[in-house]
Protein backbone atom coordinates (compact mmCIF):
# COMPACT_ATOMS: atom_id res chain seq x y z
CA UNK A 1 0.00 0.00 0.00
CA UNK A 2 1.13 3.48 -0.84
CA UNK A 3 1.77 6.15 1.75
CA UNK A 4 -0.59 9.14 1.44
CA UNK A 5 2.20 11.33 0.04
CA UNK A 6 2.97 8.73 -2.67
CA UNK A 7 -0.53 8.87 -4.16
CA UNK A 8 -1.11 10.22 -7.66
CA UNK A 9 -3.79 12.88 -7.09
CA UNK A 10 -4.05 15.31 -10.01
CA UNK A 11 -4.93 18.94 -9.23
CA UNK A 12 -7.42 19.22 -12.12
CA UNK A 13 -9.66 16.46 -10.77
CA UNK A 14 -12.42 16.72 -8.12
CA UNK A 15 -12.88 13.94 -5.54
CA UNK A 16 -15.69 12.40 -3.47
CA UNK A 17 -15.82 10.96 0.05
CA UNK A 18 -16.32 7.55 -1.63
CA UNK A 19 -13.03 7.92 -3.58
CA UNK A 20 -14.48 8.52 -7.03
CA UNK A 21 -13.11 11.37 -9.13
CA UNK A 22 -14.71 13.61 -11.74
CA UNK A 23 -13.07 15.82 -14.35
CA UNK A 24 -14.42 18.11 -17.05
CA UNK A 25 -13.62 16.61 -20.46
CA UNK A 26 -14.96 18.92 -23.16
CA UNK A 27 -18.75 18.98 -22.81
CA UNK A 28 -18.70 15.78 -20.76
CA UNK A 29 -17.55 14.89 -17.25
CA UNK A 30 -15.25 11.86 -17.00
CA UNK A 31 -15.51 9.68 -13.87
CA UNK A 32 -13.34 6.98 -12.29
CA UNK A 33 -11.85 5.91 -8.96
CA UNK A 34 -8.90 7.57 -7.26
CA UNK A 35 -5.38 6.24 -6.93
CA UNK A 36 -6.13 5.76 -3.22
CA UNK A 37 -9.17 3.59 -4.04
CA UNK A 38 -7.36 1.38 -6.55
CA UNK A 39 -4.43 1.00 -4.13
CA UNK A 40 -6.76 -0.09 -1.31
CA UNK A 41 -8.60 -2.54 -3.58
CA UNK A 42 -5.50 -4.25 -4.91
CA UNK A 43 -5.44 -5.99 -8.29
CA UNK A 44 -8.66 -5.19 -10.14
CA UNK A 45 -10.04 -8.15 -12.09
CA UNK A 46 -13.48 -6.94 -13.27
CA UNK A 47 -15.38 -3.68 -13.72
CA UNK A 48 -19.16 -3.60 -14.23
CA UNK A 49 -20.35 -0.38 -15.85
CA UNK A 50 -23.76 0.96 -16.92
CA UNK A 51 -25.04 1.32 -20.48
CA UNK A 52 -24.75 4.50 -22.54
CA UNK A 53 -28.03 6.36 -22.10
CA UNK A 54 -28.53 5.33 -18.46
CA UNK A 55 -29.23 8.23 -16.10
CA UNK A 56 -28.22 8.48 -12.45
CA UNK A 57 -28.66 10.90 -9.59
CA UNK A 58 -25.74 12.11 -7.49
CA UNK A 59 -24.80 9.42 -4.95
CA UNK A 60 -26.56 6.63 -6.85
CA UNK A 61 -24.68 3.38 -7.52
CA UNK A 62 -23.61 3.15 -11.17
CA UNK A 63 -21.48 0.01 -11.17
CA UNK A 64 -19.05 -2.19 -9.30
CA UNK A 65 -15.34 -2.87 -9.32
CA UNK A 66 -14.05 -6.30 -8.31
CA UNK A 67 -10.55 -6.92 -7.04
CA UNK A 68 -8.80 -9.96 -5.64
CA UNK A 69 -9.73 -8.57 -2.19
CA UNK A 70 -13.31 -7.31 -2.50
CA UNK A 71 -16.22 -6.08 -4.61
CA UNK A 72 -16.90 -2.36 -4.21
CA UNK A 73 -19.79 -0.27 -5.43
CA UNK A 74 -19.21 2.80 -7.59
CA UNK A 75 -21.22 5.93 -6.77
CA UNK A 76 -22.05 8.88 -9.00
CA UNK A 77 -20.18 12.02 -7.93
CA UNK A 78 -22.86 14.04 -9.73
CA UNK A 79 -26.11 13.44 -11.57
CA UNK A 80 -26.21 12.92 -15.31
CA UNK A 81 -26.70 10.70 -18.33
CA UNK A 82 -23.98 8.26 -19.38
CA UNK A 83 -22.62 9.29 -22.80
CA UNK A 84 -19.61 6.93 -22.98
CA UNK A 85 -18.07 3.99 -21.16
CA UNK A 86 -14.44 2.88 -21.23
CA UNK A 87 -14.86 -0.34 -23.23
CA UNK A 88 -11.16 -1.17 -22.79
CA UNK A 89 -11.83 -2.08 -19.14
CA UNK A 90 -13.81 -5.17 -20.20
CA UNK A 91 -10.59 -6.83 -21.41
CA UNK A 92 -8.09 -4.84 -19.34
CA UNK A 93 -9.57 -3.99 -15.92
CA UNK A 94 -6.02 -3.64 -14.59
CA UNK A 95 -5.87 -0.26 -16.36
CA UNK A 96 -7.69 1.09 -13.29
CA UNK A 97 -4.65 0.08 -11.20
CA UNK A 98 -1.95 1.27 -13.57
CA UNK A 99 -3.56 4.50 -14.80
CA UNK A 100 -6.70 5.43 -12.80
CA UNK A 101 -7.13 8.89 -14.36
CA UNK A 102 -6.36 8.32 -18.05
CA UNK A 103 -6.44 4.73 -19.30
CA UNK A 104 -8.55 3.61 -16.33
CA UNK A 105 -11.41 6.14 -16.49
CA UNK A 106 -14.82 4.46 -16.27
CA UNK A 107 -17.67 6.55 -17.66
CA UNK A 108 -18.43 9.94 -19.17
CA UNK A 109 -21.66 11.76 -18.44
CA UNK A 110 -23.62 14.76 -19.59
CA UNK A 111 -24.03 16.46 -16.22
CA UNK A 112 -27.44 17.59 -14.98
CA UNK A 113 -25.90 20.44 -12.98
CA UNK A 114 -22.35 21.64 -13.67
CA UNK A 115 -22.21 23.23 -10.19
CA UNK A 116 -22.11 19.72 -8.68
CA UNK A 117 -18.60 19.29 -10.09
CA UNK A 118 -17.24 22.35 -8.30
CA UNK A 119 -18.92 21.22 -5.07
CA UNK A 120 -16.70 18.10 -4.96
CA UNK A 121 -13.44 18.03 -3.01
CA UNK A 122 -10.26 19.65 -4.31
CA UNK A 123 -7.00 17.68 -4.10
CA UNK A 124 -6.13 19.52 -0.86
CA UNK A 125 -9.52 18.74 0.71
CA UNK A 126 -9.33 15.10 -0.38
CA UNK A 127 -5.83 14.73 1.06
CA UNK A 128 -7.04 16.27 4.32
CA UNK A 129 -9.83 13.68 4.47
CA UNK A 130 -7.42 10.80 3.75
CA UNK A 131 -5.07 11.93 6.51
CA UNK A 132 -8.04 11.95 8.90
Task: Name each model-derived stretch.
Residues 79, 83-84, 90-97:
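Charged, amphipathic alpha-helical coiled-coil/dimerization segments
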Residues 22-24, 68, 85-88:
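Residue-level recognition of beta-strand microenvironments
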Residues 35-37, 69, 78:
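Short glycine-rich, polar/acidic loop-and-turn segments at beta strand-coil junctions
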Residues 57-73:
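Charged, well-structured alpha/beta interaction segments
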Residues 1-61, 94, 98-117, 123-132:
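Acidic, low-complexity mobile loops and tails
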Residues 76-79, 123:
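ATP/adenylate-binding site constellation spanning eukaryotic-like Ser/Thr protein kinases
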